[in-house]
Amino acid sequence: QRDILALFTPIMRDAAVAEFGPYEALRQHVKRVRQHSLDNLDYYLARFELEATNNGNQVHYADSADEMNSIVLDICQQHGARKVAKGKSMVTEETGLNDYLQRGGLQVMETDLGEYIVQQAGETPSHIAGPALHKTRDQIRELFLDKHDLGERELESISDLVGEARVVLRDHFLQAEVGIIGSNALIAEKGYS
């Protein structure tokens, strides 16, 4: 199934790119903006930290994956958290944050549906934008029947599966004491992500 995904990913990307019009010009512009940001990273990080702090946030820096994971666990423990709701984040995937927090005694639940599915299956994401693209509807159905203690029920349609995930995840959202999200971009001038 992953081989099929590898075949179709470039096709899906090319179809999406076609919708953008002057793709190459946009690509070059983004490349210049990114390089400018990297060339001036110290300034932008300091500015972001100042603005984020002014917004009531606390900014932490880490030199390694272990240090980042330790900082997050410490924050969770300081707040007496037992349950964590975690949004999709490639950084936390790369640092192994979920496993680290679980070893620290926390229950971590992914909030992105695809990430949730692969988490429940004990697998790793197959694709950055579609973590569970390699799973069939029947595989997800069997997984939910096995993992969710919701009694007898019909899980025949995709909407049945999504509805069940919504019920389980909503319960976790309401019980979680800490939420963790990632950010693809930081707005230095505003201190937002």
Question: Where is each model-derived feature located?
Answer:
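The feature marks the mature, well-folded catalytic cores of soluble enzymes
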Residues: 1-193
